[in-house]
């Protein structure tokens, strides 16, 4: 097999990474970035067809990747994910990126919808961390949780999503302290990133979101993937328990408004 084109180096040679929510968007870009830098990557998602396509594309580019259909909110599914990772080696990097969102105001949101969002967005990260923890401790690995600017700023229609993303930042701090000598745990906080989710947004709302950034454009999944790769790499060996905001200055503009 041809070696992947190393545009960004080989920081993850000999390492194994698990990326959830990897069938599209930030997760797919992160899986590709880690594989490009030498990691063997296990992609996890419920979207089997799209996930297989992403894994195949990584392989065609010379990387090592396999896809596992799994629900991050189901504890038993994590045994299969870790077993798949072990076909490459112990887990060195865990990127907990899977999410679901229901844009509905609190007074109209059903309890099952609320619970499902917390199960995927928050509990899924806890279950993944716990399943991979023996490897992560042994390998002195790194974990990156994908939060959101919704954790910091109230945006109508996102009560469960915001609650779960805010809780992820607290979980990040807790895990970093509890397992600090052995495992680094950080979070990324993306802002307006141009993924398929924006296909459902009106042109007017898209323009307003761009205008609310300091750089006056959407971010790309690849830009978030670059931040995740940095936090996962040895260059970030003295960084843990914190979050890296990747929002093009959206938070600053909001604070100044």
Residue ranges: model-predicted function:
Residues 105-106, 110-118, 198, 209:
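Substrate-binding pocket helix/loop in short-chain dehydrogenase/reductase
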Residues 148:
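Residue(s) in the substrate-gating loop at a strand-loop-helix junction
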